Regions:
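Active-/binding-site microenvironments in catalytic and ligand-binding cores
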Residues: 1-244
């Protein structure tokens, strides 16, 4: 029997503040009675970055003139995925091409590759954070394992179509330069974001801030991270895996 694994962080005003700011406001109209049923209409409004929480990056994020995320073919955002187990990676440990050579032998051309470090779950503060897929410790940002340029070049050479992460993308390797991964920054300059530029320059989409990848037990699954049809360089997604 197929099993569905939800890999998305919840979006709410309680979202962990050091990195993201989410503002969801709700307006309720007066209660009316319709055919004997009391109804109180509600409308919510949301303001946040398209790169907030679980989202997908299109090449336009770093390459001028590329298509908006709403014009990316839908089939690029779902399909067969290779799950690469990196759960033994510790604090500030790089994910390299050598790691992929050893652990990614099951990666095929056209795959989505999911890098399973378990870092989100390792930094969940309590039951609520674990349930909602949210990191609750500053160490999530300051001490996480991170992908490297060599890893990104390996992905491009294998002609994968997307790469998904459950750890911060590449911020932590620059902590010793005085950069931060929190909302206030300062963030690394684009020329230092080698993983972003390597992937997106070659049309490899990035799916960031996944969670619950440790619940995936098989090394190949079907995976979905379909964006909204936005005229923007990225979009929130509801990411999930189907394990047969």
């Amino acid at each position: 029997m197929a099993r569905i694994i939800d890999c998305s962080m919840i979006i709410s005003n309680e979202t962990w503040r050091p990195r993201w700011k989410v503002d969801i406001s709700t307006k309720q109209q007066k209660t009316v009675e319709i055919e004997g049923v009391k109804v109180k209409p509600q409308h919510s409004y949301m303001h946040m970055s398209v790169h907030c929480l679980t989202h997908i990056d299109s090449p336009l994020h770093v390459v001028e003139g590329r298509p908006v995320i709403g014009d990316i073919p839908i089939e690029t955002c779902f399909g067969e995925a290779a799950v690469v187990d990196l759960t033994d990676k510790g604090e500030l440990e790089p994910i390299t091409a050598e790691d992929m050579e050893k652990r990614g032998k099951h990666v095929r051309e056209g795959d989505i590759v999911l890098l399973k470090t378990g870092w989100t779950e390792k930094n969940a503060g309590g039951d609520t954070e674990k349930r909602e897929g949210l990191p609750a410790d500053v160490n999530y940002w300051n001490k996480g394992p991170y992908p490297t340029r060599s890893m990104a070049e390996w992905m491009v050479a294998r002609k994968v179509k997307a790469v998904g992460f459950d750890c911060p993308n590449e911020c932590t390797q620059y902590m010793d330069k005085g950069y931060e991964c929190t909302r206030t920054g300062p963030h690394p300059p684009l020329e230092d974001e080698h993983v972003h530029r390597t992937h997106l320059n070659h049309g490899v989409l990035q799916i960031e801030y996944l969670c619950n990848l440790t619940a995936i037990k098989k090394d190949r699954v079907m995976f979905f991270a379909v964006p909204l049809k936005l005229k923007a360089e990225g979009s929130p997604v509801r990411a999930f895996a189907i394990e047969e």
